[in-house]
Amino acid sequence: MKRSKRVACVEATAVVALSMTSAGIAHADDELVVNTNPAASREAPADLSSLKPVVNVLAAPDTSSIVPDTGPSPYVPGVNTQSGIVTDAQTRAYGSFAIPYTTGRVQDGNQSALGTTSANFLSTTYPYRAIGKLTFSAGYCTASLIRRSVIVTAAHCIQSFGSGSAIYSGWQFRPGHYGASGATSAQIAPYGTWTWAALVRPSTWANGTDTGSGAARNNDIAVIAIAKNASNQFIGDLTGYLNYGWNNYSFVSSSKTGNLQTASVTTFGYPALLDGGAIMQRTDGPTYTTTVSGASQLWQGSNLTGGASGGPWIVNFRARDAVLSGGAAVGSSPNLAIVGVTSWGSADPNASKDNYASQFRQNTQYPNATYGNYGSGNIASLLNTLCTTAAPGGGTFASQGYCN
């Protein structure tokens, strides 16, 4: 992966460290930043091609001796759906042994940018359109919607590890982005360009004390509230948004897979290695839980390199349900859910490819089983901190509808 320069904060002027630790209240390891100048400079579509992918610049730890976890999660798995929190000890996933994978463009038919409209692009249909390119002062990453107007990405897309209050600036989100040569403005931003309103990243990422070594860290995760557009609309009302799960949600251990904790996971991103980061890419394959230098990680074969950072790792992914025949019964429907975001992986395009994600889960920094109405562990705490924060215009981001 390529290195990116560190850029000091330009717009963000309110940094808040929270110290309350009881269940349901923001955890001490959350740090909030509010955009006090949302009308600040924005990149023009023509400038996007000059941006570089932002990657995790920390050194990769030694992975020569890592092995997948074989035991179950010590915590109760759960998923936050649009109907509320569901805890399910019988979550299911399907996969095969070893780490094979497939990668391809998210497209439908002939996806030439010339002579077509955004309606032809698979990336503008749900659930793909809840994923998009996140641009900012240092380059670009990938992000996805997990609440009505909240996206999740990697903490290293907010700031360099251990850089304190020095963060990047100018975050903008383009859901369903397609930027191949000759793309029209409607294809580049089919649902518009959206500006950040506030963000939360772990204080242990900011101060450089997060559990792990090098790039492998417990909490390379951040959430960003997206401001409403000029028509006073929330982004999620146009695109929809995705569920998120925690604590090995949909992972299972079976003798068929060597008693490894595994799930079938689909990951998305805009890696610079593939189509120059201009087109959304998808990787499918079995994924395992593991521990690298003390950090809880998800592990998958993948060639989604720099630019895919912050992209979602989704279990039970499906876009269109098939019609069953031959007497087959539907059975209980598994929940599509994001269980982590891309953090780091192999940088050599000709070497064995593997990627790692900071897992959504309870851990040393985020031990609580409940953070407000948002579930367990790191992802829930970050959301709880963001959503209970005072928002411009009065009330909180939750009361204004951002976190529905």
Language-model segment annotations:
Residues 28-145, 376, 381-404:
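Protease-domain processing segments flanking chymotrypsin-fold serine proteases, especially trypsin-like
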Residues 124-178, 285-292, 301-302:
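Catalytic histidine site
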Residues 217-304:
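Chymotrypsin/trypsin-fold serine protease catalytic domain
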